[in-house]
Amino acid sequence: MASADELTFHEFEEATNLLADTPDAATTSRSDQLTPQGHVAVAVGSGGSYGAEDEVEEESDKAALLQEQQQQQQPGFWTFSYYQSFFDVDTSQVLDRIKGSLLPRPGHNFVRHHLRNRPDLYGPFWICATLAFVLAVTGNLTLVLAQRRDPSIHYSPQFHKVTVAGISIYCYAWLVPLALWGFLRWRKGVQERMGPYTFLETVCIYGYSLFVFIPMVVLWLIPVPWLQWLFGALALGLSAAGLVFTLWPVVREDTRLVATVLLSVVVLLHALLAMGCKLYFFQSLPPENVAPPPQITSLPSNIALSPTLPQSLAPS
């Protein structure tokens, strides 16, 4: 048991002196310290609200500065850095888009399932370059093989076919999508429900659709005319089907006449490209014009030839 002296009230001189020196100091009792767990009392002075507002303003200033820096770092369309982003694709993405162009299916949109709002120029650029090179090389090889079968055919390397193939393929892969994109933009003003693809998406559609022509051109080395036309028809059907299935969601909101005419023109231009490649790069050269050997005729031995005298010695 505690003694009576221990239970009596004691004054502490240090506390008394402290209160005398600082009469405005806040005091707390022991009951205030015994607060339930999980409850924290926070005392905010008169300047606390201003500190919170300063932090919010500082964060907003940082966000605005970061956005301004990003806008300044974004290159213009006339710079090389702007177009560099369109070549930033990996091999798996390019192969997936090539596979999508080779296996068109109804209801399977190439733009939505393979491009995913990220068109690239890497695939279309190299597909067009490869197709132009393969066209020129196989066209010359066809003439070499024809000369080996028929020596009367005269062959000389035709390097101009590389230029013709490059200009034809790149003009088709860029000018036709440009005209199609412009027409769809114009039809968007007539039919407000239509949402055309962007120009780069249209170029990407046409560029990947030309990939199927590369193996077709290689198979044209087989010197069988009907087999060459069969391979051409199969490649044209796959490529044109991919274009129709991709463009149909855009043009179906328009009138039936406009949609039918537009898709027919797209298929017709594709067919003209395939036929032009077949007829120009794989035409057979005519045989070399060789002069016939002179024919020597012998006269019978019983026919005597009369000698001829010069005109000056002939009798008058």
Swiss-Prot record:
It is found in: Golgi apparatus, cis-Golgi network membrane; Golgi apparatus, trans-Golgi network membrane; Late endosome membrane. The modification N-acetylalanine is found at A2. InterPro entries: Yip1_dom, Yip5/YIPF1/YIPF2. Keywords: Acetylation, Endosome, Golgi apparatus, Membrane, Transmembrane, Transmembrane helix. Residues 146-163, 220-231, 278-316 are lumenal. The keyword Acetylation applies. It is a multi-pass membrane protein. The chain crosses the membrane at residues 125-145, 164-184, 197-219, 232-252, 257-277. Residues 25-36 have a biased composition (Polar residues). The keyword Membrane applies. Belongs to the YIP1 family. The gene is YIPF2. Residues 16-37 are annotated as: Disordered. Residues 2-124, 185-196, 253-256 are cytoplasmic. This is Protein YIPF2. One of its GO terms (cellular component) is trans-Golgi network. Interacts with YIPF6; this interaction may stabilize YIPF2. May also form a ternary complex with YIPF1 and YIPF6. GO terms for biological process: vesicle-mediated transport. It comes from the Eukaryota. GO terms for molecular function: small GTPase binding. It comes from Homo sapiens (Human). Its main location: Golgi.
